[in-house]
Amino acid sequence: MTEFIPPGSLFHALSSPFAMKRGGQLHHARIAYETWGRLNAGATNAILIMPGLSPNAHAAHHDSNAEPGWWESMLGPGKPIDTDRWFVICVNSLGSCKGSTGPASYNPITQAMYRLDFPALSIEDGANAAIEVVHALGIKQLASLIGNSMGGMTALAILLLHPDIARSHINISGSAQALPFSIAIRSLQREAIRLDPHWKQGHYDDTHYPESGLRIARKLGVITYRSALEWDGRFGRVRLDSDQTNDTPFGLEFQIENYLESHAHRFVHTFDPNCYLYLSRSMDWFDVAEYANGDIIAGLARIRIQRALAIGSHTDILFPIQQQQQIAEGLRRGGTHATFLGLDSPQGHDAFLVDIAGFGPPVKEFLDEL
C-alpha cells in the first residue's frame, strides 16, 4: 500500500539518526506539515496543531491546496484560529501514511518498505519530531500548542519533553493516559486487522490487502467516535429500502449498518493498515504518570505554561470528559491558569470536528486573550 500525501505538503528532514523512545532509530526520515498565515518578525505568533490518529496535515485549504481541510471551519482568516493574526503549523504524525515517515514508507537503508521493521512507535517520538519542525521554522517558543484526540496526548508529551516551548495550550478531547475501555477498543481493532488472512504479518500488497480487517477496525472506531444519542437522532431504527438490501443471510438491514459500511469502505482506501496498528498502540502506551512515579496529577503539574484550556464533550466515550477535567486539574496544580469546559455536544468524541458552533467560540476567546 502506498502513502497518501496531500498536494501542497511541506517536508522537514528529521535529524539522522532519529532515536526512538522504545529503542531503534530512523535514518533520513521526514515529517510532513502545512502552514497558514505569516510568521511575524519576532516569530512570536506561531501556533502548532497536533492532529488525531487518521488526519493528515491538511487542516484547511491554502494557496497550494484548495481542497477543504479536516478543520476547515475552525482555521482561517476571521475564524476561531485566525490566520490573519496567527502563523499556524499542522504536523502529520510520525508513523502515519500521510507524508511523514511510517511503516508504509521505504527504508533508505534496505530500499524496502519498513512494514513491521519500523521501530516501536511512542507518542513521545511524534512529539520530538514535531518540535524539530518548529525549530526548523525559526520558532523558539509557540504562542499556543493545540492538540486534539491523539494530538492532545502528543501535545502533553511536547510540553513535558520540551519545557518553555509554548506559552499556552489548548487540549481538545485529549487525555493524559489511555483508559482501559479505549485500550480494549483499539485492541479489537488491531485484532481485526491481524486476523485478516491478507495481512500476512504486515507483508500485504495492493492485490492481497487486508481490506476486511481494516474495514471492521474502522467500523469499531466510528462507533466510539460518536454517541448513542447521535445514532438515535440520525438513524433511529430506520431500515434500508428494498433496493439497498440483498439476500445475504444476516446482511445489511438498518440504515446505521449501511452508514458504517459506506464510511469504512471509503477509509480503507486512504489509510495503511500497518500504520494504523503502530499509531493505535502508541496511544495505549502513553501515560503522563510515567513522568512522576505513577502519579498522573503530579506528572501534569510538571508542565510549565502560562494558560491552558481543556475542552471536551460530555457524550465522548473514547476520551471521556473526566480526562479533560483531569488535565485542567493537573495543570493548575503546577501553577498554570487552566480552564476546563465540558460541552453538551451530541457528536461524542468527534464533536470538535463538527460542532464548531460549540467548540469554536471558546477556542477563539482563549486565543484572543493571548
Curated annotation (Swiss-Prot):
One of its GO terms (molecular function) is homoserine O-acetyltransferase activity. GO terms for cellular component: cytoplasm. Pathway: Amino-acid biosynthesis; L-cysteine biosynthesis; L-cysteine from L-serine: step 1/2. The gene is metX. It is an enzyme of class 2 (transferase). The record marks R186 as: Important for acyl-CoA specificity. Keywords: Acyltransferase, Amino-acid biosynthesis, Cysteine biosynthesis, Cytoplasm, Transferase. Pfam families: Abhydrolase_1 (PF00561). SUPFAM superfamilies: alpha/beta-Hydrolases. Belongs to the AB hydrolase superfamily. MetX family. Residues 52-55 are annotated as: Important for substrate specificity. Transmembrane segments: none annotated. One of its GO terms (biological process) is cysteine biosynthetic process from serine. It is found in: Cytoplasm. This is Serine O-succinyltransferase. Transfers a succinyl group from succinyl-CoA to L-serine, forming succinyl-L-serine. HAMAP family: MetX_acyltransf. It catalyses: succinyl-CoA + L-serine = O-succinyl-L-serine + CoA. InterPro entries: AB_hydrolase_1, AB_hydrolase_fold, HAT_MetX-like. The lineage of its organism: Bacteria, Pseudomonadati, Pseudomonadota, Gammaproteobacteria, Lysobacterales. PANTHER family: HOMOSERINE O-ACETYLTRANSFERASE (PTHR32268:SF11). Its main location: cytoplasm. The active site is at S149 (nucleophile), D316, H349. Homodimer.
